[in-house]
């Protein structure tokens, strides 16, 4: 397997990414995600979301979701916006719309969720994921994407 860095992440598919997250210690993920590589890694992950979106599972779902990823350089938080409407998913790192759901989590939790390495419902129940807004939507978000398993 490869190192946990933006270049290696950009060159592997979703399943290999899931295996990489699973094989990398949380402390190493936290270290990398607190540094200069953070934006590239987050951009790579979010840019893949539309390709993993399952319109067949979304049905008539119309939603704006804000993902607040904490633990950035200097204690910063990065916010990405996922818009699900008309059977499609779009993503931006410049949120412009009012969210139906806003989820806040640290980068290790986020990467585990998007790589299938963690149970989002359990993470919510234990406070690792904080959700504000439509909690019914929060419970369904993972089902809207074809999340790889390591």
PLM regions with names:
Residues 1-150:
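Feature captures hydrophobic
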């Amino acid at each position: 397997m490869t190192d946990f860095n933006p270049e290696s992440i950009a060159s592997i598919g979703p399943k290999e990414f899931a295996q990489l997250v699973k094989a990398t210690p949380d402390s190493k993920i936290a270290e990398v995600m607190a540094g200069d590589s953070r934006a590239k890694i987050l951009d790579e992950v979010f840019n893949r979301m539309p390709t993993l979106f399952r319109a067949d599972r979304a049905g008539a779902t119309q939603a704006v979701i804000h993902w607040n990823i904490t633990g950035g350089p200097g204690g910063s938080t990065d916010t990405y916006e996922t818009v699900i409407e008309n059977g499609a998913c779009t993503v931006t790192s410049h949120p412009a719309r009012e969210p139906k759901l806003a989820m806040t989590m640290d980068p290790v939790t986020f990467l585990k969720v998007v790589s299938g390495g963690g149970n989002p419902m359990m993470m919510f129940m234990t406070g690792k994921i904080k959700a504000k807004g439509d909690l019914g939507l929060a419970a369904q978000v993972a089902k809207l994407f074809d999340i790889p398993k390591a």
